[in-house]
Amino acid sequence: MEDHYGYMSIKNMPMSERPREKLLSFGSQSLSNAELLAIILSTGTKDRTAIDLARSILNTSTEGLRGLKDCTIEELSQVKGVGLAKASQIIAAVELGKRISLTTKVNNYKIKGPDDVSNLLMEEMRYLNKEIFNILLLTTKHDIIAIENISVGSLNASIVHPREVFNRAIKRSSSAIILAHNHPSGDPNPSGEDINITKRLIEAGNIIGISVLDHIIIGDGVYFSMKEHKLI
């Protein structure tokens, strides 16, 4: 229904201009970022179409679409017309995109040194506002089997337990692992706790027969390799 102020719902748009119909007829590549986001949102509000709402969301960051990568539910909910349900839909879609991207990178990816780990994880981890501790599970030839998250939050011995780390490695028949976590401050230099946890995991790995090859700390565009710095 069109009102006196020019508002038109998506249902009253020509079929060829409706996001879902465009996708079905011409493929997802034919849609703009706002149209793709509108499909995820599904509905707009009583006075704004889903496309209008999508444009408002994309305009909340100077980075546009890329800005959604780090948005929180709280930030998205500040956009007029976006409640917890719509914010959750967006966060879920973004997370799926991240996981697909990482899975694509991981396939047949061989680790020859710390640069390879940095190239794989830097863009994903450098802007995180919480510490994330991951392990890279490797074959005997150092091809990546998987990357698994162990903990979220400040790194300490109580949340990074050898049992949890090596249980993942054993389940995936991993011969070796590399530890990786980020420093939200941007400074990748290790803390005493970082070093102690690493040594503890190396000792456990030696007993089990799974080598801990390195511990990479991701900063803002820089990384620290404990192996390179002879800390392990």
From Swiss-Prot:
Keyword Zinc attached = yes
Annotated Zn(2+) binding lies at 181, 183, 194
Where can the motif JAMM motif be found?
181-194
Q: Which GO terms describe its molecular function?
A: metal ion binding; metallopeptidase activity
The protein's matches in SUPFAM superfamilies, at most eight in alphabetical order, are given as: RuvA domain 2-like
Looking at the record's lineage, which domain of life comes first? Bacteria
| Signal peptide (from-to) | none
Its keywords, alphabetically, are: Hydrolase, Metal-binding, Metalloprotease, Protease, Zinc
Q: Which GO terms fall under biological process for this protein?
A: proteolysis
Per UniProt, residues of the MPN domain are 110-232
Family statement drawn from the similarity comment of this UniProt entry: Belongs to the UPF0758 family.
The name of this protein is: UPF0758 protein Clos_1766
